[in-house]
Amino acid sequence: MNQVFDDNFKGDRVLSLITGLYTMLIKAHGDKKEFYMFDSLDPQKIYNASRNFEIIVWKLASKKNEENQPYLLSNEINSSQANLSFEREFGKIIGRTDYFAFTLSEKTERAVTRVIQSFTTGIFLPF
């Protein structure tokens, strides 16, 4: 995704950005596209993906090229009107990935708590 903000890059910046975001999400989900009941995910990776989305939104809104133009026109209809639908859509993605990471971390915490409780309340074995 750094390629999007490289002055020397002459290719399709939108394709580069979307491919980078897609790849990041797949990596955050453990390189999987299908999940089953007992599959698990690392909540920290999902959380990190959410922070990366925030960084991308910030860079798209603020980073300029050598001619003081944005690398990608993302949230402007014309020079006097801002189009905030871009930020709203990315805000939804950030909110969903944050909530998903929180839910996953709660699941992990509950599993650890159950193991500790069953261990501490277990029957002593004779020796």
Q: Where in the sequence are the language-model features?
A:
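Mature extracellular/secreted ectodomains of secretory-pathway proteins
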Residues: 1-104, 111, 115-116
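Short, low-complexity, Pro/Ser/Thr/Gly-rich segments in the mature regions of secreted, periplasmic
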Residues: 108-127
